[in-house]
Amino acid sequence: RSADAQQHGLWGKRQNPGLWGRSADAQQHGLWGKRQNPGLWGRSAEPGQPGLWGKRQNPGLWGRSAEPLQPGLWGKRQNPGLWGRSADAQQPGLWGKRQDLDIGMWGKRQKAGLWGRSADPGQLGLWGKRRSRIGLWGRSYEPPQFEDLEDLKKKSAIPKPSEQ
């Protein structure tokens, strides 16, 4: 490190972006400063700076923005399909309202046939009203509300050897 923080050494203002060092002054444009290359795994010296952890964080990375409200991986712009959870339950993260139809097994639009459980028993998840119609091994919360109940029983019943 240079003797004076203002000198133009490796740790000074002219530090080559892309190196792994940290500038002597947080306001200098070192790797950890304002010009940090998006995509690196470092953290900017100040949370408000557009470093990897700041506002310009690349969606798809596993980091978390310094502030939950910033559109980092955990923020509002979280890419649907990732396994993260948005910082706010109301944000359209993986677990939120805009959950993708096929990807989210735990959301309201759960695709019938998956093994997940919907967030609300009244929702049409695998464990909900439509389960017995699917013919899976569970029991629906409510009795089957369709007329072909007897036909379903015949199809789901184990055939006796005498009937074969």
Curated annotation (Swiss-Prot):
Tryptophan amide modification, residue list: 11, 20, 32, 41, 53, 62, 74, 83, 95, 106, 115, 127, 137
Propeptide residue range(s): 1-6, 23-27, 44-49, 65-70, 86-90, 118-123, 140-164
Disulphide bond pairs: none
Main location: secreted
Gene Ontology BP terms: neuropeptide signaling pathway
Region ranges (Disordered): 1-92
Record keywords: Amidation, Cleavage on pair of basic residues, Neuropeptide, Repeat, Secreted
Chain segments annotated as coiled-coil in the UniProt record: none
Record localization: Secreted
GO CC, any one term: extracellular region
Functional description taken from the UniProt entry: Metamorphosin A may be part of an internal signaling system involved in control of metamorphosis.
Family designation: Belongs to the LWamide neuropeptide family.
Protein name as annotated: LWamide neuropeptides
